[in-house]
Design a protein with these regions (language model features):
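Catalytic phosphate/metal-binding cores of nucleic-acid and nucleotide-processing enzymes, i.e., regions
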Residues: 1-117
Length: 117
């Protein structure tokens, strides 16, 4: 893939994630420069610091250095959670987060669900 096609491939994933967040009522937009020009993340929103990565392979792996960098970019005392979004060449897409953050979200969801039943 050329650099231009890689850039377009990345923009497509970022657009997809922004669209999904907006559909849920979350104010979200793509960051200028996709997180590399003074922006913390690829996508601006109030809940997550999102890093999007496209892979030109079928199998994907979580790059520990990218994950550590993403976690280190969370501002002190911020409630925003790091979220690493990966997509393979077949457009299968995964969201990776810290397991403790996942269980915190799940607990809140279940408490809300039980309160409405």
């Amino acid at each position: 893939m050329s650099d231009k096609s890689n850039c377009a491939f990345g923009a497509e994933l970022e657009h997809y994630i922004v669209q999904k967040m907006v559909e849920l009522g979350i104010p979200a937009s793509k960051s200028k420069g996709s997180g590399n020009q003074g922006q913390i993340a690829d996508i601006n929103n109030p809940y997550f610091i999102v890093e999007c990565k496209n892979k030109s392979t079928e199998s994907i792996t979580v790059d520990a250095k990218v994950w550590e960098k993403l976690k280190s970019e969370v501002p002190l005392h911020s409630k925003r959670l790091p979220l690493y979004v990966l997509r393979n060449k077949n457009k299968q897409t995964w969201a990776v987060m810290d397991v403790d953050d996942f269980f915190t979200i799940l607990k809140g969801y279940l408490e809300n669900l039980n309160g409405r039943v």
